[in-house]
Amino acid sequence: MKLIGAEPGMKAVMTRNSDHFVSLGGRVAIARRVKAHLLVSIHADAWVKSNVRGSSGFALSQKGATSAAARWLAKNQNESDLIGGVNIATVNKQVATVLVDMTSTWTIGYSLGLGAAVLDELRSINRLHKGKVEQAGFAVLKGQGIPSILVETAFISNPTEEQLLKNANHQQKLAQAILTGIKKQLAADKTLVEQG
């Protein structure tokens, strides 16, 4: 959080500041409330086999985005400013569906680029569990119009990686890698920078 706060034009907002549960939908709601331009969910993975290791990145799948778009449209049809300032309630359903689909397509594409940039940076610190950004229907990634990634820094179920995750120096390296990946994506695709 300190690294991001030191960057001009960037601000980090935590979804929680203590060890308490915040629902996945609650995390997305926080991102919407603060008008987040990006959502980066950072975790440690776990598996039944202790030899599994590596960092991973996830973005929303197209199937998940379509499902989220339908839920979003139903829940937010009376709100404006969620898609380019267009009040969805004032346009016909076909136009609304096209707007939501266009936003979903752009959001997923940006998220995939962001995930790839972050994984490229994490690769220098930890081996990758998979060589590319994977896609799945994680609820925390379903914030309509907010490019989102889920980063699995390592496997806490792997004793070696667990020790690394406890190390403050390693934590700093992970944080710096994630920030550098974010900055590289922002430089490569200035859409979010231009939105202010």
What residue spans do the PLM features occupy?
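Active-site-adjacent mobile loop/cap segments within catalytic or ligand-binding domains
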Residues: 38, 48, 99-196
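Catalytic-core regions of hydrolytic enzymes
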Residues: 1-92, 104-116, 192-195
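Exposed acidic/Ser/Thr-rich ligand/metal-binding surfaces
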Residues: 93-97
